[in-house]
Amino acid sequence: ILKELGLDREGCYAIAFNGGLIYDCAAQKTLHRRTIPLEYARVIFEKTQEAGLYCHTYSDTSLLCRHVGEETRIYTQAIHIPVVEDPLLPEHLAKEPCKMIVIDLHDRAKMDAYRAAMEPWAKGKISMFYSSPHYLEHVPEHVSKGHAVKKLCELLQIPLANTVAAGDQENDISMIEAAAVGAAMKNATDAVKASADYITENDCNHSGVAEILRKFILA
């Protein structure tokens, strides 16, 4: 994806895994990484299985899941990543993952119930938030896109006052609030719009990001 977008060059950095990883695209080097302890990953896999929910995580190069299903196929249509199916996850996890994601394509209420049941255990350990109506993200406590924006500015010695961020889902709110200018897409959730300084006239599928670049970067 970085190559397709022309971002694999000097001066380009990627914040991945909802803030769990900061990557120097040109040097192909990890600058900052936060991970989920394996004991927590085991609990999440166990509890999602009990709830009848699909869950996957990641290695450095692949998506890791217990079984490939409709959720895997839909997810990888948008996120092009190799898939490794391993029924013995999480026992076979070689290293702590940056994030885990729970997916239900048809029953949001089931995920809401799982989230509510997990919150007492997750407090102080794991942050949970939606990145789409069907994707419930799990990252280490205090990891977010907002924290990652601040960390990247610190690493590059760039004032936070010189930052612009844009998004449309719950996992984008911390970043929108952290940046000097936070923009919400026209199709963003109400909570995202409430946190933003600017709401685009176009949605994310119709040049919403280009609108922000023209207004706040190229003007």
Predicted regions: what is each one?
Residues 7-8, 94, 157, 193:
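Alpha-helix termination/capping residues and helix-transition junctions
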Residues 1-72:
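Active-site phosphate-binding/coordination module
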Residues 8-10, 18, 122-124, 178-179, ...:
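Short, structured coil segments at secondary-structure junctions
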Residues 47-166:
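Conserved acidic, metal-coordinating active-site core of Asp-based
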Residues 137-219:
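Mg2+-dependent phosphoryl-transfer enzymes with acidic/Ser/Thr/Gly-rich catalytic loops
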Residues 3-6, 49, 115-120, 150, ...:
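Class I S-adenosyl-L-methionine
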Residues 21-23, 64, 109, 137, ...:
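Flexible, glycine-rich phosphate/dinucleotide-binding loops
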